[in-house]
């Protein structure tokens, strides 16, 4: 299983860098910051499905 270290999130602002992550909700997040903020908002229910677009 792919994992991401989201310690230090959520962050108030994310860069526009595009390094896609596919979440367990089948949504593509544009980068680690966007993904980790969503993980923080989900109280840990969101996980990484795989690296890259969904």
UniProtKB/Swiss-Prot annotation:
Pfam families hit by this protein: Kazal_1
Glycosylation sites: 43
Single Gene Ontology MF annotation: serine-type endopeptidase inhibitor activity
Domain of life: Eukaryota
Keyword terms: Disulfide bond, Glycoprotein, Protease inhibitor, Repeat, Secreted, Serine protease inhibitor
InterPro entries: Bifunctional_prot_inhibitor (IPR051597), Kazal_dom (IPR002350), Kazal_dom_sf (IPR036058), Prot_inh_Kazal-m (IPR001239)
PROSITE patterns associated with the record: KAZAL_1, KAZAL_2
Sites annotated Reactive bond 3: 16-17
GO-annotated cellular components: extracellular region
Cellular localisation: Secreted
Coiled coil: none
Bridged cysteine pairs (disulfide): 6-36, 14-33, 22-54
Annotated CDD domains: KAZAL_FS
SUPFAM superfamilies linked to this entry: Kazal-type serine protease inhibitors
Annotated ranges, domain Kazal-like: 4-54
Main localization of the protein described in the UniProt heading: secreted
Keyword Disulfide bond: yes
UniProt-listed Gene3D superfamilies: 3.30.60.30
Comment text on domains: Avian ovomucoid consists of three homologous, tandem Kazal family inhibitory domains.
UniProt name for this protein: Ovomucoid
Organism (species): Fulica atra (Common coot)
Lineage: Eukaryota, Metazoa, Chordata, Craniata, Vertebrata
């Amino acid at each position: 299983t792919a994992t991401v270290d989201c310690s230090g999130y959520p962050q108030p602002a994310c860069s526009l860098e595009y390094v896609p992550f596919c979440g367990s909700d089948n949504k593509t997040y544009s980068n680690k910051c966007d993904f980790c903020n969503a993980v923080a908002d989900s109280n840990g229910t969101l996980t990484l499905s795989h690296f890259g677009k969904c």
